[in-house]
Amino acid sequence: MKAVIFVKQSQRLPGKHLMTICGEPMLSRIYRTLEHTGLFETVVVYSKYPDLALDGCLIERDPTTGTLIDSILDSIVKFGEFLAVGGDLPLLNSEVVSEFVLEYDGRPLAAVNSEGTIEPLFAIYNRRIYGELLESSKHSKQIFTFVKERFHLIQINEERSRSLFNVNTLEDLEKARTIADCSHTASR
């Protein structure tokens, strides 16, 4: 299985994926966390940024111009089975990733955070779901309903849900910086 980090240009917080948390770009932090699990044959950043470059990160360009569904459909064709991860989850930790991936039994799988929100960018997609997702995308570009109806859903408890905190505003970024565990990066 691969891990695919989805990155598109943010309207609310432009350049957020390269903003630093614990002295490193948010995107590098997520990438490193996924690599650290040892669960993935490859970690890939799937980016709509035309000129994104980060040392140590494998970056593939997302050629789609539509919604998240379009990017996921394209990713299924390119990567097959993968854990989809949002590029704005700087608090993601390897324990949560490992526990989630170990729940995977071949059925598409998505996390539901402690507030009841389905996380389409903390989910496992595979070719089994491609046809249904493609057909659904012809009628609706809303991925939440599709995931709710077609995926095996795993409830993430409140403590673990904190690692799924996403950054969309400067206030979110400051909050993430405040609660991030920077002890592992102190020597950098």
Task: Label every PLM stretch briefly.
Residues 1-14:
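N-terminal nucleotide-binding beta1-loop-alpha1 segment
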Residues 45-52:
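Short, polar loop motifs at secondary-structure junctions
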Residues 53-85, 91-99:
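Short phosphate-binding loop-to-helix
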Residues 139-188:
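Conserved alpha/beta core of the MobA/IspD/sugar-nucleotide pyrophosphorylase nucleotidyltransferase superfamily
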